[in-house]
Swiss-Prot record:
Belongs to the CinA family. SMART domains: MoCF_biosynth. It comes from the Bacteria. InterPro entries: CinA, CinA-like_C, CinA_C, CinA_KH, Competence-induced_CinA, MoaB/Mog-like_dom_sf, MoaB/Mog_dom. It comes from Trichodesmium erythraeum (strain IMS101). CDD domains: cinA. HAMAP family: CinA_B. This is CinA-like protein.
Length: 425
């Protein structure tokens, strides 16, 4: 069986909203082991929806629609599908009853326009919506074609998918084998370099190993097709362990682990604490750290020293060094890191100062130049220079700077685990 995702909505075509439904469904189909080769976005236009249907029914057997199930005139998905298959719409009283109850729970009366949502093709099964008023359908209008419709609201779509669609597909025998995946994450190595190191694994068929990169992070997805998670892990884990050995310290986490969560785990294990001093990243590093539940146990806080006087007043950065070297320099990065350690009384301090652009660069200090400082309570202070000039985008430079700073600390913490610890008294 081949599935196809069709997302209906002019707002998607215009880029007004992100098409997160397609991403979710694509991952779900892969996990279920259902082949999926095509995705289409089409506006709220009956003729164009029919054109998409004509193409999709010729190449796929499971057509998954999202969007266009609401009560407004431009919500045309179900009516257009029914018209395409020359099938009448029937008002279903159980849908009317469900919508009426949902309105009553909010102290309201169902509007006349909502009756439209109770119209579904004759012979179609109702796909209940436990959250909203728009039900979906599961329908086999002709042999070898199954239509599923979901609302465009992601929370509603996901709930209906999990509670009804997956059990239905499993009951049809479409998911005899499932694809199980684990994603290994790396920082400090390029996608091409990692691919070269693990080249023999990229040729495997079960499990498959696929590299991809985003915002400087490289990932390897190891996927195995099997009838159970236990059998899949027997295929995946040996490959995973070999790749981790090859990558060494460039490997940092699995699946949902982030650099911030890994750093937090290492700090908890060592009983150490952290503070940050930020300039060009404007608090992004602190935000990343505090996004981890329980981070107050090791993260004390930070200073956003965007203006030079703040660097001097709050972080004890030397005015003469600022005048001589500039705020974007090794010496200032070091003083920011050591300053925040002393001010907040932590074991570790990280600083970031740089030129995120789009303006402010020069021949000697171009946009993308970033210095990251790392200080320890025992006065060991280092700084590292990075040139992210190839990114040429302010948000990218800031984001990569934060991740690079976290990775630097991760490596320091990992190496310090290998030798005896001497904590601050």
């Amino acid at each position: 069986m081949i599935a196809e995702i069709i997302c209906v909505g002019t707002e998607l075509l215009l880029g007004d909203i992100l098409n997160s439904n397609a991403q979710f469904l694509a991952k779900q189909l892969a996990n279920l082991g259902i082949a999926h080769y095509y995705q289409t976005v089409v506006g709220d236009n009956p003729d164009r929806i029919k054109q998409v249907l004509a193409i999709a029914t010729d190449r796929s057997q499971i057509l998954i629609f999202t969007g266009g199930l609401g009560p407004t005139p431009d919500d045309l998905t179900v009516a257009t599908i029914a018209d395409f298959f020359e099938t009448p719409l029937i008002e279903r009283p159980e849908i009317i009853e469900d919508i009426t109850k949902k309105f009553a729970r909010r102290g309201r009366i169902m509007t006349a326009s909502n009756r439209k949502q109770a119209l579904i093709p004759q012979g179609a099964n109702i796909l209940p919506n436990p959250i909203g008023t728009a039900p979906g359908i599961i329908w086999q209008p002709v042999q070898n074609i199954t239509i599923m419709t979901f609302p465009g609201v992601p929370t509603e779509m996901k709930s209906m998918w999990q509670e009804t669609a997956i059990p239905y597909m499993q009951s049809q025998g479409w998911c005899e084998q499932t694809i199980y995946s684990r994603t290994l994450k790396f920082w400090g190595i390029t996608e091409s370099s990692l691919a070269e190191k693990v080249a023999p694994f990229l040729e495997k068929e079960n499990p498959t190993v696929a590299p991809y990169a985003n915002y400087g992070e490289v990932k390897l997805r190891i996927s195995a097709r099997a009838t159970s998670l236990e059998l899949a892990n027997k295929l995946i884990i040996p490959v995973e362990e070999e790749i981790k050995d090859i990558a060494g310290i460039d490997f940092y986490g699995i699946n949902d682990e982030s650099l911030a969560s890994v750093v937090g785990k290492l700090l908890l294990e060592s009983g150490e604490t952290l503070a940050v001093a930020e300039s060009c990243t404007g608090g992004s590093l602190g935000s990343m750290l505090t996004s981890i539940p329980g981070s107050s146990e090791y993260f004390y806080g930070g200073v956003i020293s965007y203006e030079n006087q703040v660097k001097i007043t709050l972080l004890d950065v030397n005015l003469e060094d600022l005048m001589a070297e500039g705020s974007v320099s090794h010496v200032v990065a070091k003083q920011m890191a050591s300053g925040v350690v002393k001010k907040l009384g932590t074991n570790w301090g990280i600083s970031i100062t740089g030129i995120a652009g789009p303006g402010g660069g020069s021949d000697t200090k171009p946009v993308g130049l970033v210095y990251i400082g790392i200080a320890r309570y025992d006065d060991i202070v280092e700084s590292f220079e990075y040139r992210f000039s190839n990114l040429r985008d302010r948000n990218w430079i800031r984001r990569v700077s934060v991740s690079t700073a976290l990775d630097l600390l991760r490596r320091k913490l990992y190496l310090s685990k290998q030798r005896p610890q001497h904590h601050q008294a």
